Amino acid sequence: MTMITDSLAVVLQRRDWENPGVTQLNRLAAHPPFASWRNSEEARTDRPSQQLRSLNGEWRFAWFPAPEAVPESWLECDLPDADTVVVPSNWQMHGYDAPIYTNVTYPITVNPPFVPAENPTGCYSLTFNIDESWLQEGQTRIIFDGVNSAFHLWCNGRWVGYGQDSRLPSEFDLSAFLHAGENRLAVMVLRWSDGSYLEDQDMWRMSGIFRDVSLLHKPTTQISDFQVTTRFNDDFSRAVLEAEVQMYGELRDELRVTVSLWQGETQVASGTAPFGGEIIDERGGYADRVTLRLNVENPELWSAEIPNLYRAVVELHTADGTLIEAEACDVGFREVRIENGLLLLNGKPLLIRGVNRHEHHPLHGQVMDEQTMVQDILLMKQNNFNAVRCSHYPNHPLWYTLCDRYGLYVVDEANIETHGMVPMNRLTDDPRWLPAMSERVTRMVQRDRNHPSVIIWSLGNESGHGANHDALYRWIKSVDPSRPVQYEGGGADTTATDIICPMYARVDEDQPFPAVPKWSIKKWLSLPGEMRPLILCEYAHAMGNSLGGFAKYWQAFRQYPRLQGGFVWDWVDQSLIKYDENGNPWSAYGGDFGDTPNDRQFCMNGLVFADRTPHPALTEAKHQQQFFQFRLSGRTIEVTSEYLFRHSDNEFLHWMVALDGKPLASGEVPLDVGPQGKQLIELPELPQPESAGQLWLTVRVVQPNATAWSEAGHISAWQQWRLAENLSVTLPSASHAIPQLTTSGTDFCIELGNKRWQFNRQSGFLSQMWIGDEKQLLTPLRDQFTRAPLDNDIGVSEATRIDPNAWVERWKAAGHYQAEAALLQCTADTLADAVLITTAHAWQHQGKTLFISRKTYRIDGHGEMVINVDVAVASDTPHPARIGLTCQLAQVSERVNWLGLGPQENYPDRLTAACFDRWDLPLSDMYTPYVFPSENGLRCGTRELNYGPHLWRGDFQFNISRYSQQQLMETSHRHLLHAEEGTWLNIDGFHMGIGGDDSWSPSVSAEFQLSAGRYHYQLVWCQK
């Protein structure tokens, strides 16, 4: 029977979800994850605890538009029309309500602490059984690892408590509410609460019980908290494991705590003590606490490179050894400190190869499973990442255990963001919001402080700088001086951060924003009195086809010791799967669910697609972050290791010399390089090529044996050098055939054997080619100066809010997309051994000339068409996206073969990872399926391209696919693209960079813009 005080009406009347002073009711204090083993061996080996029971699975669910619409009867029994949903899940992924994607703008009217009356509410219920043994002694808790955004809990019709902060556990004591046998839980989840104002992160806004739910049985007298810390002497040869243990329950003299440290099957150290803490002040110490210190000789240190772990088992027992319960955690012996302006791990300066990671799954929303977490970690390690920032909230508890074990440095970030507030620190400088902020910071620290992978605490993200930040910074430094604290808000270098941690600061360019200037990272280091390390909390915005200029950051990181790396934004595209009317899945972004407000495709900034398929940019990141660097001098290769702790015990260096992709010599040498060491490798006398071509030396570091995170044969690093070649000239063989020119009223036609070329005299374009009777072109060969806009070209521009500074808006305003060709010249001449076509076009818009393109086409007796192109660019038109040619080939071949940079997509400012070789790929692999279609698939540095019967030679860039630039530009989602007839070929003499320092302002560096007034390129086109 529901008591009056437990009634839904009474609970709703309090409106706890609109009171920033109420962040919880009856919630238990935060602590590390517990399992309450009753066998110390099971604790040591981390076996499943019999005292920990999952409640994940099918729950009954009913959705209402507001909490007031929930009937009182729901507390007692399931509603007749209730559905069944899986917990954990987001209810939006089950068709209830709509997910909302917004970056800065709050999804609700900003009126803190109040939320809309229309507040979608999910009512969950579960019937489960409890064994009598759990009720006879001890305490039964329920743990909700994550509920968004706030919830009330009832058990057997009685109100238990309230919780908010969607990214940390809410734990309640159910002991007084349970009875043996069948019990019923009722959980009312509200989509919006005052806590939503602190959760304005750039992500999908979803709701529900989206993390694990479990029951935990603890003894009446129990371990209520424990903290482990490692300390060292100067040379790390001796360590102390300090364990502070706190108990709850009857404090009896016979109680003891034993802490034992294990390395595998070996007990390294152990200590036992009664309760009674060290003296704190004149009143004494804590009677319910004890601190034990275990000495460890020559500890094996933990790092992301070598994640050595011990296991600490904490036993609560009586004096005669009777075990009451045991808790345990992995222990990594490591020290983090800042000294002389450097962030040090175990005395060595770190170089952070980091990435920001949202918890996102394309099918399950914000629900994370172990398989996906492990997949992310393996991909990060395989691509030379060593650090991850939990952006922008504490992650699933299992994530930290996996980072401990596989080896990743973690920035653990509080679930605080008020980006949409004006000013941004409106709440964070308001003392009424300090309790809510405090809970989010302190509970994160209390949950995660035993993880060695957590090396930095973060106070949150994009919330300005307020007095509350200063207070919480001081609290962390007081309770956990073993880790630095970072916080970007307020300018990235306030008193609330130990690390200068800007976002999207550029290498050499200042961004003098009012109040919070964003200096170049080089300048920041030299500001008067500034001696902190600089680690970019976000940089290299990887939205769509991006990450241009990434190499420039890494050049600076390696040049300036206090520039200690950064965290790329971000790891995974946040697209969600929807289904069309035929049941086919497609990738959706902001606005596709009818969600308003929305920020469209801005949710897709990942180095990997939502299904974890890599973007081409991931290879660039891997290459720039590689742990081996190479220098070539003569025939000597100098290999430098950037590992701080790891000796190269699983690496071979494979080298190969190739002429135009044909191997001439190769070899393999084992690497024997110590941490931060060097190895010189002398190559044998290299063979001299007998023919013309490009001679390249390629080195690759290969791991012959599988590791915990990679398969055997994994390539971890590589480099290429172009070698000097002998001068060699291959003269064309004489041809007795002479192409024949005929002229009609509309065309010039050239014929040679079974080949014909047709130039339209009115347009001046190559309008058709024949091989035998087969036409080769579906569209004429024309100049091309534009590209389907990248996200970086678009910036923040949209239909209702034009940004005139965005590249695409400049190109549109100047008429680049609408330019039409005015023919200035089209002549044909018969030479002694060839036919020469000469054309000139003025590309104009509204009477203004933007480009003048002059071409000659020389068709010789071998059937080769040599195209020379000279382009003049108007001085007052924006720098073009490309200078090249385009046509639609009639042929559709299965494969593309080219000699140039590859195999992955590459662009002028993102090509350091590409290698020069002869590549052969399916046509479908030449297209990169960005969810928001754009220019894609370029391959630079190309000397030869083979496709179907066609061969192109020169020095050019190309992309080739079934989609035109026009279709890419006009299509909003990749699943709406349709394969066009034939194949679209774009061959560029020059192509602008793609940028990527950020995606909302022009970020293509000057050296990668097409800023010259005149351009020339040459191309040879023939048929095989």
From Swiss-Prot:
A Pfam family (short name) is Glyco_hydro_2_N
The protein's superkingdom reads: Bacteria
GO cellular component terms, alphabetically, are: beta-galactosidase complex
Q: Which residues bind Mg(2+) 1?
A: 417, 419, 462
- Residues the entry annotates as binding Mg(2+) 2: 598
Q: Where does substrate bind?
A: 103, 202, 462, 538-541, 605, 1000
PANTHER family, sorted: BETA-GALACTOSIDASE
What is the official name of this protein in its record? Beta-galactosidase
Specify the species: Escherichia coli O1:K1 / APEC
User: What is this organism's lineage?
Assistant: Bacteria, Pseudomonadati, Pseudomonadota, Gammaproteobacteria, Enterobacterales
